[in-house]
Amino acid sequence: MSENSTIVSNTANLVKFLNLDQKGSILAEYIWIDGANGVRSKTKTLFKKPSSVEDLPEWNFDGSSTGQAPGEDSDIYLRPVAIFPDPFRMGDNILVLAECWNADGSPNKFNHRHECAKIMEAHKDQKPWFGLEQEYTLFDLYGNPYGWPKGGFPGPQGPYYCGVGTGKVYCRDIVEAHYKACLFAGIKISGINAEVLPSQWEFQVGPCVGIEMGDHLWISRYLLHRVAEEFGVKISFHPKPIPGDWNGSGLHTNVSTQAMRDEGGMKAIEEAIQKLSTRHAEHIAVYGDDNTLRLTGRHETGNIDAFSYGVADRGSSIRIPRSCAKEGKGYFEDRRPASNACPYQITGIMMETICGGI
């Protein structure tokens, strides 16, 4: 990995300091979503281990430096909403997911969690389960797909998906490290696999209930960026990272309610798909930036201008797994969301469409 990435953290030198006694202090890494749909974080020292988010103090940051506020009124407030164990500092140290709020007490315009949480609470009796398949691509420091020949291209797609062996997969060490970091942090990560495009991988998170889906997906993204730092590698969630005859990256969204999982649930699945067909444009609007480059009707995608569904059809907007069609119950997969989409917006509009607004 050193050939492609020359700037790597001196982790071995850091370890002896990580093992120093903190004298009872707790390091809390506050994490939030910025104005460019990325993650930011900063650290606060606590003098008592919190037992819940209610024990954590509200904090603030300069929103003019994150695209979330103008310079003349730049204070944005961080309200903790979830706690996770910290896999980097370990011990009693924690990761804190926080929502962003304006000084006037209103949610920041990039705080999509707030509205999502309200609709999840309104429809909690439906017992919604979600599972997200996060695809991403790894690049070196200079913007080249990791492991690709300098100034050239690897062989055509085919051997890379779930590949094994040198020349078929790249950066497995980063992927494995991220997997373990997620497990340590309590993320409901359910699997990993190499993807169709060389240097592209996927991890799955879920099933998660309601708002938990967005929380776990965002923290897993944060962990991926942090792990990649250690290796001097960049993570891209762009839905079409390489132009041409190469697969894009998606955030396939698996959805079910209790009615869909019960006997005869196929009727509820079909009713949900019918509702989704009437709001295709509204969903596409929040399903990620640059998705037009990915949803072309090629490379295992449907066309962005047309809604479609089918059993086991990866070229459709909505796929019903063959096993679910056979059993007459289960879940469906929305294949439209781009890899850079916000999970709160995806799951929020999904519940609004299939269960009703509030």
From Swiss-Prot:
Q: Supply one GO BP term.
A: glutamine biosynthetic process
Which cellular component, as a GO term, is one annotated location? Answer: cytoplasm
Organism ancestry: Eukaryota, Fungi, Dikarya, Ascomycota, Pezizomycotina
Q: Which organism is it from?
A: Tuber borchii (White truffle)
| Primary localization | cytoplasm
Instruction: Kindly provide the name given to this protein in its UniProt entry.
Output: Glutamine synthetase
EC number(s) stated in the UniProt entry for this protein: 6.3.1.2
Give the family from UniProt.
Belongs to the glutamine synthetase family.
A GO molecular-function annotation: ATP binding
This protein's assembly is summarised as: Homooctamer.
Q: Where is the GS catalytic domain?
A: 112-358
